[in-house]
Amino acid sequence: MSEASGRTAGNEMPAKKQKLSSDENSNPELSGDENDDTVSIESGTNTERPDTPTNAANAPGRKGWGKGKWKSKKCKYSFKCVNSLKEDHNQPLFGVQFNWHSKEGDPLVFATVGSNRVTLYECHPQGEIRLLQSYVDADADENFYTCAWTYDSNTSHPLLAVAGSRGIIRIINPITMQCIKHYVGHGNAINELKFHPRDPNLLLSVSKDHALRLWNIQTDTLVAIFGGVEGHRDEVLSADYDLLGEKIMSCGMDHSLKLWRINSLRMKTAIRESYEYNPNKTNRPFVSQKIHFPDFSTRDIHRNYVDCVRWLGDLILSKSCENAIVCWKPGKMEDDIDKIKASESNVTILGRFDYSQCDIWYMRFSMDFWQKMLALGNQVGKLYVWDLEVEDPHKAKCTTLTYPKCASAIRQTSFSRDSSILVAVCDDATIWRWDRLR
């Protein structure tokens, strides 16, 4: 992978030499020609991810949703669209992530991925978005789907992991502007990357090859493979660690959600041994654990591809192509999730967040750092933001964000760590910045 930026010394994240000026880049009222908001980056050619093969309108009927819908009411959060940009490859942008590992006072930096491009931007006051760096994969057929931030535990440098259609994970150091590592192992495209919430070296990847993999990027070892006998039977589309990093919930095209514990003695030992492994001191390769059996599995939540899942405390938020994010938990309401058995067949659905015009797959929601807000875009450029800070989930309030020129499918959203900025990326290669007013 080559970078479009020149090499710069120093500990601060270097910027691209051809920086966009504030006149080209900052557009607080979004007036004038859209071309004024275009970021000039080398172009590439790639195809979109296909639409969902089954129409949600024709999906089979389902039983009741437990305690009812989470109706939309006026939300206490308000946002204003202050800027937009367009990357000139004109291919869908599938992923966006703010770097939440920055310190207070540091610039607000986010990364976007799409086509064979990885691009870093910095948010400035008054709505400005400044282009910092752009990386282009040598293979024009690469199509990046996902990215995740971490940091080097020795130098504290920010690191960005990216992956996509070729199934290769690349680790980029924005300080040195180099792709410092890459990992090959998955037999097909990688749909999502996630770093452990308490260990910056543990990277989780989920793939079209039906499996999840856990990597230690400090020692370059593959700790474990989750899949096989009772694993996913089709593409794994999303996964998430719980806040303590003890459990993983995964979901995929087989309509299922699966729980994998990584705080078992077997997994704790494997992680410890991955840190102790030194290829210079042994001729033996590291032995990866193969986890064939999840600790819980269900297909009772969704009737279509499950393309996004996130933990909310001990509860699960997941969505399919059915115009609703479902809040649920394994077992019965009173059950302790840490004591749920693999044979458990019960699930408790607590409610759902409803929205409209979002029945294509690979549309991912996000939460802010403190899990007080939930954001999702639909296929016509509309953003939904829910206030999660309510005692009764049925009273979760929603605000809908629209802007006339934003009319393409919003693939992913990301909040800045301080929740002051919400960024959305779209199928038409556009990036939209919304600033919080209160």
UniProtKB/Swiss-Prot annotation:
Component of the prc2/eed-ezh2 complex. May interact with ezh2, hdac1, taf9 and yy1. PANTHER family: POLYCOMB PROTEIN. The keyword ATP-binding does not apply. It comes from the Eukaryota. Residues 40-57 have a biased composition (Polar residues). Belongs to the WD repeat ESC family. WD repeats lie at residues 88-131, 139-182, 185-225, 231-270, 301-338, 356-396, 405-438. InterPro entries: PcG_WD-repeat, WD40/YVTN_repeat-like_dom_sf, WD40_repeat_CS, WD40_repeat_dom_sf, WD40_rpt. The gene is eed. Gene3D superfamilies: YVTN repeat-like/Quinoprotein amine dehydrogenase. GO terms for cellular component: ESC/E(Z) complex. It is found in: Nucleus. This is Polycomb protein eed. Keywords: Chromatin regulator, Nucleus, Repeat, Repressor, Transcription, Transcription regulation, WD repeat. Residues 1-70 are annotated as: Disordered. One of its GO terms (biological process) is chromatin organization. Polycomb group (PcG) protein. Component of the prc2/eed-ezh2 complex, which methylates 'Lys-9' and 'Lys-27' of histone H3, leading to transcriptional repression of the affected target gene.
